[in-house]
Design a protein with these regions (language model features):
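Preference for solvent-exposed, low-hydrophobicity sequence contexts
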Residues: 1-201
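Extracellular/virion structural assembly segments
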Residues: 2-5, 10-18, 192-335
Length: 335
Protein backbone atom coordinates (compact mmCIF):
# COMPACT_ATOMS: atom_id res chain seq x y z
CA UNK A 1 0.00 0.00 0.00
CA UNK A 2 1.33 3.44 -0.89
CA UNK A 3 2.12 5.87 1.91
CA UNK A 4 1.62 9.67 1.74
CA UNK A 5 4.95 11.50 1.75
CA UNK A 6 4.06 13.51 4.88
CA UNK A 7 3.67 10.38 6.98
CA UNK A 8 6.74 9.17 8.86
CA UNK A 9 8.18 5.91 7.58
CA UNK A 10 11.05 4.48 9.63
CA UNK A 11 13.47 1.75 8.54
CA UNK A 12 15.16 -0.50 11.12
CA UNK A 13 18.83 -0.99 10.19
CA UNK A 14 19.74 -3.37 12.99
CA UNK A 15 22.02 -3.24 16.02
CA UNK A 16 25.20 -1.90 14.39
CA UNK A 17 26.03 1.66 15.43
CA UNK A 18 26.97 3.84 12.46
CA UNK A 19 25.36 1.43 10.00
CA UNK A 20 25.94 2.52 6.38
CA UNK A 21 22.89 2.34 4.12
CA UNK A 22 21.83 3.23 0.57
CA UNK A 23 18.41 4.18 -0.79
CA UNK A 24 17.45 3.37 -4.40
CA UNK A 25 14.52 4.61 -6.50
CA UNK A 26 13.34 1.08 -7.27
CA UNK A 27 12.20 -1.95 -5.31
CA UNK A 28 15.73 -3.36 -5.61
CA UNK A 29 19.29 -2.10 -6.05
CA UNK A 30 19.06 -1.89 -9.85
CA UNK A 31 17.67 1.64 -9.55
CA UNK A 32 19.39 4.97 -9.14
CA UNK A 33 21.04 5.82 -5.84
CA UNK A 34 19.25 8.79 -4.31
CA UNK A 35 20.91 8.79 -0.88
CA UNK A 36 23.76 7.21 1.06
CA UNK A 37 24.45 7.74 4.72
CA UNK A 38 24.95 6.25 8.16
CA UNK A 39 22.45 5.59 10.94
CA UNK A 40 23.39 5.70 14.62
CA UNK A 41 21.74 4.17 17.66
CA UNK A 42 20.04 6.85 19.74
CA UNK A 43 20.36 6.89 23.56
CA UNK A 44 17.97 4.45 25.19
CA UNK A 45 17.48 2.40 22.01
CA UNK A 46 19.14 -0.79 20.81
CA UNK A 47 18.60 -0.45 17.05
CA UNK A 48 19.62 2.15 14.48
CA UNK A 49 16.62 3.72 12.75
CA UNK A 50 16.34 6.13 9.83
CA UNK A 51 13.25 8.16 8.86
CA UNK A 52 13.11 7.92 5.08
CA UNK A 53 10.13 10.10 4.10
CA UNK A 54 12.20 13.27 4.52
CA UNK A 55 14.97 11.73 2.40
CA UNK A 56 12.56 10.83 -0.41
CA UNK A 57 10.46 14.02 -0.38
CA UNK A 58 12.58 16.22 -2.66
CA UNK A 59 13.24 13.40 -5.11
CA UNK A 60 9.54 12.52 -5.26
CA UNK A 61 8.51 16.13 -5.87
CA UNK A 62 10.77 16.24 -8.93
CA UNK A 63 9.86 12.78 -10.16
CA UNK A 64 6.12 13.46 -10.10
CA UNK A 65 6.32 17.08 -11.24
CA UNK A 66 3.64 18.35 -13.61
CA UNK A 67 4.44 19.45 -17.14
CA UNK A 68 2.82 22.85 -17.69
CA UNK A 69 2.44 22.68 -21.45
CA UNK A 70 -1.00 23.35 -22.88
CA UNK A 71 -1.02 21.80 -26.35
CA UNK A 72 -4.64 21.23 -27.15
CA UNK A 73 -6.23 18.04 -25.90
CA UNK A 74 -3.66 15.50 -24.86
CA UNK A 75 -2.72 13.37 -21.92
CA UNK A 76 0.49 12.52 -20.23
CA UNK A 77 1.28 9.42 -18.22
CA UNK A 78 3.70 9.52 -15.33
CA UNK A 79 4.16 7.35 -12.23
CA UNK A 80 1.42 7.84 -9.68
CA UNK A 81 3.63 6.54 -6.92
CA UNK A 82 7.29 5.76 -6.48
CA UNK A 83 8.80 2.65 -4.89
CA UNK A 84 12.07 2.92 -2.97
CA UNK A 85 14.33 0.35 -1.34
CA UNK A 86 17.01 0.36 1.34
CA UNK A 87 20.19 -1.74 1.34
CA UNK A 88 23.02 -2.33 3.77
CA UNK A 89 25.83 -2.83 1.29
CA UNK A 90 24.39 -5.53 -0.99
CA UNK A 91 21.95 -6.80 1.64
CA UNK A 92 18.30 -5.92 1.06
CA UNK A 93 16.57 -4.37 4.09
CA UNK A 94 13.09 -3.33 2.93
CA UNK A 95 11.14 -1.48 0.24
CA UNK A 96 8.22 0.93 0.40
CA UNK A 97 6.04 3.12 -1.83
CA UNK A 98 5.34 6.85 -1.43
CA UNK A 99 2.96 9.15 -3.29
CA UNK A 100 3.09 12.94 -3.31
CA UNK A 101 0.49 14.00 -0.75
CA UNK A 102 0.60 16.83 1.77
CA UNK A 103 -3.02 16.73 2.90
CA UNK A 104 -2.04 15.43 6.36
CA UNK A 105 -5.13 13.25 6.54
CA UNK A 106 -5.30 9.51 6.93
CA UNK A 107 -8.72 9.13 5.32
CA UNK A 108 -7.55 8.37 1.78
CA UNK A 109 -4.27 6.58 2.33
CA UNK A 110 -5.72 3.08 1.93
CA UNK A 111 -7.91 3.85 -1.09
CA UNK A 112 -7.00 2.74 -4.59
CA UNK A 113 -8.11 6.05 -6.07
CA UNK A 114 -7.66 9.57 -4.78
CA UNK A 115 -9.11 12.85 -5.95
CA UNK A 116 -6.30 15.30 -6.64
CA UNK A 117 -8.55 17.84 -8.42
CA UNK A 118 -10.81 20.13 -6.41
CA UNK A 119 -10.88 23.69 -7.84
CA UNK A 120 -11.95 26.24 -5.23
CA UNK A 121 -14.85 27.72 -7.20
CA UNK A 122 -15.04 25.34 -10.17
CA UNK A 123 -15.45 28.36 -12.44
CA UNK A 124 -13.36 28.58 -15.62
CA UNK A 125 -13.30 31.23 -18.33
CA UNK A 126 -13.77 30.31 -21.95
CA UNK A 127 -10.38 29.73 -23.53
CA UNK A 128 -8.61 28.92 -20.26
CA UNK A 129 -6.53 25.71 -20.19
CA UNK A 130 -7.25 23.18 -17.50
CA UNK A 131 -5.83 19.91 -16.29
CA UNK A 132 -7.47 16.84 -14.83
CA UNK A 133 -5.02 14.81 -12.77
CA UNK A 134 -5.86 11.32 -11.55
CA UNK A 135 -3.58 9.54 -9.14
CA UNK A 136 -3.53 5.77 -8.75
CA UNK A 137 -1.25 4.48 -6.00
CA UNK A 138 -2.29 0.93 -6.89
CA UNK A 139 -0.58 -0.57 -9.94
CA UNK A 140 -3.68 -2.63 -10.71
CA UNK A 141 -5.96 0.35 -11.27
CA UNK A 142 -6.96 1.62 -14.70
CA UNK A 143 -8.68 4.79 -15.86
CA UNK A 144 -11.39 5.41 -18.43
CA UNK A 145 -11.83 9.15 -18.84
CA UNK A 146 -14.43 10.98 -20.89
CA UNK A 147 -14.37 14.69 -21.66
CA UNK A 148 -17.57 16.53 -22.58
CA UNK A 149 -18.37 20.00 -23.99
CA UNK A 150 -15.94 19.91 -26.89
CA UNK A 151 -16.32 22.48 -29.71
CA UNK A 152 -18.93 20.42 -31.56
CA UNK A 153 -20.93 20.01 -28.34
CA UNK A 154 -20.68 16.25 -28.51
CA UNK A 155 -19.04 13.92 -26.05
CA UNK A 156 -15.69 12.40 -26.80
CA UNK A 157 -14.14 9.37 -25.18
CA UNK A 158 -10.51 8.99 -24.28
CA UNK A 159 -10.13 5.27 -23.48
CA UNK A 160 -7.01 5.69 -21.37
CA UNK A 161 -6.02 2.46 -19.68
CA UNK A 162 -2.94 3.11 -17.60
CA UNK A 163 -1.18 1.91 -14.51
CA UNK A 164 -0.06 5.05 -12.76
CA UNK A 165 -1.44 8.56 -13.19
CA UNK A 166 -3.08 10.54 -15.95
CA UNK A 167 -2.98 14.22 -16.84
CA UNK A 168 -5.73 15.19 -19.26
CA UNK A 169 -5.11 18.64 -20.75
CA UNK A 170 -7.68 20.67 -22.60
CA UNK A 171 -9.00 24.18 -23.15
CA UNK A 172 -12.41 25.61 -22.42
CA UNK A 173 -13.44 26.35 -25.99
CA UNK A 174 -14.40 29.96 -26.69
CA UNK A 175 -17.15 29.03 -29.15
CA UNK A 176 -18.72 26.24 -27.14
CA UNK A 177 -22.45 26.84 -26.53
CA UNK A 178 -22.22 24.76 -23.37
CA UNK A 179 -22.09 26.26 -19.92
CA UNK A 180 -20.39 23.36 -18.25
CA UNK A 181 -17.44 21.06 -18.87
CA UNK A 182 -17.75 17.62 -17.34
CA UNK A 183 -14.96 15.14 -16.89
CA UNK A 184 -16.32 11.75 -15.95
CA UNK A 185 -14.25 8.80 -14.85
CA UNK A 186 -15.65 5.35 -15.47
CA UNK A 187 -14.92 2.27 -13.43
CA UNK A 188 -14.90 0.28 -16.66
CA UNK A 189 -16.27 0.45 -20.19
CA UNK A 190 -19.84 -0.20 -19.03
CA UNK A 191 -20.51 3.50 -18.35
CA UNK A 192 -20.51 3.09 -14.58
CA UNK A 193 -19.50 6.57 -13.42
CA UNK A 194 -17.13 6.54 -10.47
CA UNK A 195 -16.00 10.17 -10.41
CA UNK A 196 -17.36 13.35 -11.92
CA UNK A 197 -15.88 16.85 -12.04
CA UNK A 198 -18.04 19.69 -13.38
CA UNK A 199 -16.46 23.01 -14.34
CA UNK A 200 -18.73 26.02 -14.83
CA UNK A 201 -17.91 27.96 -18.01
CA UNK A 202 -18.03 31.75 -17.68
CA UNK A 203 -17.35 34.47 -20.24
CA UNK A 204 -13.82 35.81 -20.57
CA UNK A 205 -14.18 38.93 -18.45
CA UNK A 206 -11.24 38.65 -16.05
CA UNK A 207 -7.55 39.01 -16.79
CA UNK A 208 -5.85 36.75 -14.25
CA UNK A 209 -6.11 33.24 -12.86
CA UNK A 210 -3.87 31.35 -10.47
CA UNK A 211 -2.75 27.78 -11.17
CA UNK A 212 -1.34 25.86 -8.23
CA UNK A 213 -0.38 22.37 -7.14
CA UNK A 214 -2.74 21.40 -4.35
CA UNK A 215 -1.99 19.27 -1.31
CA UNK A 216 -2.92 16.08 -3.18
CA UNK A 217 -0.47 16.71 -6.02
CA UNK A 218 -3.06 17.81 -8.60
CA UNK A 219 -3.05 21.05 -10.60
CA UNK A 220 -5.99 23.32 -9.73
CA UNK A 221 -6.87 26.89 -10.67
CA UNK A 222 -8.74 29.91 -9.36
CA UNK A 223 -10.09 32.70 -11.57
CA UNK A 224 -9.39 36.11 -10.00
CA UNK A 225 -12.87 37.63 -10.13
CA UNK A 226 -12.20 40.66 -7.93
CA UNK A 227 -10.00 43.72 -8.33
CA UNK A 228 -6.27 43.50 -8.90
CA UNK A 229 -3.31 45.86 -8.81
CA UNK A 230 0.18 45.40 -10.29
CA UNK A 231 3.22 47.27 -9.00
CA UNK A 232 6.93 47.43 -9.91
CA UNK A 233 9.51 48.27 -7.23
CA UNK A 234 13.00 49.40 -8.29
CA UNK A 235 16.35 48.82 -6.64
CA UNK A 236 18.65 51.22 -8.49
CA UNK A 237 22.45 51.03 -8.58
CA UNK A 238 24.18 54.31 -9.44
CA UNK A 239 27.64 55.88 -9.54
CA UNK A 240 28.92 59.41 -10.02
CA UNK A 241 31.25 60.62 -12.74
CA UNK A 242 32.49 64.03 -13.79
CA UNK A 243 29.83 66.16 -15.44
CA UNK A 244 30.90 67.49 -18.85
CA UNK A 245 28.91 70.29 -20.48
CA UNK A 246 30.27 69.30 -23.88
CA UNK A 247 29.53 65.56 -23.64
CA UNK A 248 26.07 64.46 -22.58
CA UNK A 249 27.33 60.90 -22.03
CA UNK A 250 29.25 62.20 -19.00
CA UNK A 251 26.05 63.14 -17.26
CA UNK A 252 27.19 63.04 -13.64
CA UNK A 253 25.12 60.41 -11.81
CA UNK A 254 24.66 57.25 -13.89
CA UNK A 255 21.92 54.66 -13.30
CA UNK A 256 23.69 51.50 -14.44
CA UNK A 257 21.69 48.61 -12.97
CA UNK A 258 18.01 48.30 -12.00
CA UNK A 259 16.51 45.27 -10.26
CA UNK A 260 12.74 45.24 -10.72
CA UNK A 261 10.43 43.39 -8.32
CA UNK A 262 6.96 42.94 -9.81
CA UNK A 263 4.09 42.24 -7.42
CA UNK A 264 0.33 41.81 -7.71
CA UNK A 265 -2.44 42.35 -5.21
CA UNK A 266 -5.26 40.03 -6.28
CA UNK A 267 -8.77 39.77 -4.85
CA UNK A 268 -11.02 36.76 -5.19
CA UNK A 269 -14.73 37.02 -5.74
CA UNK A 270 -17.12 36.27 -2.90
CA UNK A 271 -16.64 32.71 -1.67
CA UNK A 272 -18.99 30.34 0.12
CA UNK A 273 -18.03 28.59 3.36
CA UNK A 274 -16.93 25.44 1.51
CA UNK A 275 -14.90 27.42 -1.04
CA UNK A 276 -13.21 29.53 1.63
CA UNK A 277 -12.32 26.34 3.49
CA UNK A 278 -10.18 25.27 0.52
CA UNK A 279 -8.20 28.51 0.25
CA UNK A 280 -5.45 27.01 2.41
CA UNK A 281 -4.71 24.65 -0.47
CA UNK A 282 -3.79 27.65 -2.63
CA UNK A 283 -2.17 29.95 -0.08
CA UNK A 284 -0.03 27.10 1.27
CA UNK A 285 1.11 25.83 -2.13
CA UNK A 286 4.85 26.06 -2.91
CA UNK A 287 4.23 25.86 -6.68
CA UNK A 288 2.00 28.66 -8.03
CA UNK A 289 1.66 30.24 -11.49
CA UNK A 290 -0.11 33.44 -12.52
CA UNK A 291 -1.95 33.07 -15.83
CA UNK A 292 -2.33 36.25 -17.89
CA UNK A 293 -5.45 35.53 -19.93
CA UNK A 294 -4.99 38.74 -21.96
CA UNK A 295 -1.51 37.64 -23.09
CA UNK A 296 -2.22 34.28 -24.74
CA UNK A 297 -2.62 32.60 -21.34
CA UNK A 298 1.05 32.98 -20.47
CA UNK A 299 2.05 31.30 -17.20
CA UNK A 300 4.37 33.24 -14.89
CA UNK A 301 5.94 31.56 -11.85
CA UNK A 302 5.09 33.49 -8.68
CA UNK A 303 5.42 33.12 -4.94
CA UNK A 304 2.59 33.93 -2.55
CA UNK A 305 3.69 36.39 0.13
CA UNK A 306 0.61 36.18 2.38
CA UNK A 307 1.65 35.33 5.91
CA UNK A 308 -1.61 33.67 6.94
CA UNK A 309 -4.94 32.26 5.75
CA UNK A 310 -7.87 33.47 7.90
CA UNK A 311 -10.92 31.23 7.93
CA UNK A 312 -14.51 32.23 8.52
CA UNK A 313 -15.41 31.83 12.19
CA UNK A 314 -19.03 32.97 12.57
CA UNK A 315 -22.23 32.58 10.57
CA UNK A 316 -22.78 36.34 10.65
CA UNK A 317 -19.57 36.80 8.66
CA UNK A 318 -21.51 35.92 5.52
CA UNK A 319 -19.56 35.28 2.33
CA UNK A 320 -15.86 36.06 2.39
CA UNK A 321 -13.27 37.34 -0.09
CA UNK A 322 -9.51 36.99 0.07
CA UNK A 323 -6.65 39.27 -0.87
CA UNK A 324 -3.74 37.34 -2.36
CA UNK A 325 -0.32 38.99 -2.67
CA UNK A 326 2.06 37.43 -5.18
CA UNK A 327 5.54 38.30 -6.42
CA UNK A 328 7.11 37.30 -9.71
CA UNK A 329 9.56 34.48 -9.01
CA UNK A 330 11.96 35.28 -11.84
CA UNK A 331 14.41 38.19 -11.85
CA UNK A 332 13.81 41.30 -13.97
CA UNK A 333 16.96 43.36 -14.53
CA UNK A 334 17.70 46.35 -16.76
CA UNK A 335 21.24 47.52 -17.44
Amino acid sequence: MATPIWKDYTVDLGTTDGQAFTIYDKADNTGNVIYTGKAYIRPGETHAFVKVNDICADYLAQKLSLSLVFTGISYEVFPGAQTFSCYKGTTFVTSWTFYLNYEYKDGGTDKIKLRPNNPITGRIMRGMPFCITRLYPSASAAAHLRLYALPDSSSSTYPISVQGSVNLWSKANNDSPNYEITVAEYKDTTNSIDYNLALQLIDKCHRYALYYVNSMGGLDFLVIEGNWRMKDSYDRKTYKQTYDNGNLANRGTVDYHNDIARTWELHTGWLTDAQAGRMGDLLGSPLVFLCDCDDNYQLHPVIITNGDCPYKCHRKDGMIEYGINVELARNITRR
